[in-house]
């Protein structure tokens, strides 16, 4: 249950590091909060804030820095997430996209807490993708493929195994050993699901009902081609760069999470691009039943750029749970 706004306003703000965040949110909570917030996106209970970003060149490397924000009235929470995309970070043994979430009380504007949002971003992205893609299913989705075995790929496998009635999950990665590790992490979650690892993307997606791409490719790449897919496959593209071929963008029924954000992030959906004027609606429309799925045999492409209000919703719940558990570092004396 959401924390009492009056108590939140009076309590000292807290800081939660990555381990504390993990201790304060179960996988079930993450999936449920993300699903509910997505369904509520077109209501006055959830407000999407602005998304902004800019490029910075430092020591021969290019970084993208940005922020996403929003407000969840049911939790009396408003906030912002600051993130940086650094392709050099993995070679430094650092996360590619570090993130920090700041949550305030929506009624008073007082700081509620600050938390490490790096792993939580991967969790919410995967939960969002699985929830949105499953809502696009026109028949039982039994076979899934995940292309990419990084943090988001691991979380995708986990949420697929835990929340969907799939029979098989194939994980494809440049290194088969990396894909195998993603399978091992999810193996204990549910019996009856077959997990397989491969470095062959085409083989992984060939008979999949649903395909997720979540890689860190540095440039646009035809990782998944329309010709390899089932005629009615659902493809969910999550990476910063293009991970599917132009043919798929040109022929698929396209749904996005944030039309403006997707156009800002992905040139294919700007004027003149293959996806220009091909977006039929957003995820909230699908999940709330306001947008009906195509009746014929047609591929569906989900292009998800991320919605900041999901981070705020998860951050607010983590902070509320932390207070109940006595977890977190107080940032100032108690206001009560």
Predicted regions and their residues:
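Rossmann-like adenosine-cofactor binding region
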Residues: 191-271
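Glycine-rich Rossmann-fold phosphate-binding loop(s) that bind the pyrophosphate
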Residues: 149-150
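NAD(P)-binding Rossmann-fold cofactor-contacting core
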Residues: 162-189
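N-terminal Rossmann-fold NAD(P) dinucleotide-binding loop
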Residues: 153-154
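Adenosine-phosphate binding glycine-rich loop
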Residues: 18-22, 241, 247-336
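Conserved hydrophobic helix-helix packing surfaces used for dimerization/oligomerization
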Residues: 143-144, 169
């Amino acid at each position: 249950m959401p924390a009492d706004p009056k108590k939140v306003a009076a309590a000292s703000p807290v800081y939660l590091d990555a381990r504390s965040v993990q201790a304060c949110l179960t996988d079930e909570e993450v999936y449920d909060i993300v699903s509910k917030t997505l369904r509520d996106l077109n209501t006055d209970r959830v407000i999407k804030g602005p998304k902004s970003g800019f490029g910075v060149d430092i020591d021969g490397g290019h970084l993208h820095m940005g922020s996403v924000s929003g407000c969840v009235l049911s939790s009396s929470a408003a906030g912002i997430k600051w993130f940086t995309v650094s392709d050099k970070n993995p070679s430094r043994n650092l996360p590619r996209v570090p993130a920090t979430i700041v949550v305030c009380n929506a009624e008073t504007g007082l700081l509620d807490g600050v938390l490490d949002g790096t792993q939580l971003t991967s969790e919410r992205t995967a939960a969002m993708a699985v929830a949105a893609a499953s809502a696009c299913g026109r028949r039982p989705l039994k076979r899934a493929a995940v292309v990419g075995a990084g943090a988001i790929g691991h979380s995708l496998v986990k949420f697929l195994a835990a929340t969907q009635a799939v029979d098989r999950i194939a994980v494809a990665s440049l290194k088969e050993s990396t894909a195998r590790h993603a399978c091992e992490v999810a193996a204990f979650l549910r019996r009856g699901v077959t997990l397989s690892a491969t470095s062959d993307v085409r083989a992984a997606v060939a008979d999949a009902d649903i395909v997720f791409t979540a890689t860190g490719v540095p440039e646009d790449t035809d990782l998944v081609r329309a010709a390899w897919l089932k005629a009615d496959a659902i493809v969910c593209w999550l990476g910063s760069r293009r991970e599917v071929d132009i043919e798929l963008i040109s022929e698929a029924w396209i749904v996005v999470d944030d039309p403006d954000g997707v156009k800002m992030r992905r040139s294919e959906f700007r004027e003149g691009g293959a996806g220009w004027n091909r977006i039929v609606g957003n995820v909230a429309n699908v999940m709330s039943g306001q947008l009906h799925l195509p009746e014929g045999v047609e591929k569906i492409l989900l292009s998800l750029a991320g919605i900041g209000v999901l981070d705020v919703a998860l951050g607010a719940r983590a902070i509320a749970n932390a207070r109940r558990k006595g977890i977190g570092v107080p940032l100032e004396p108690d206001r009560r």
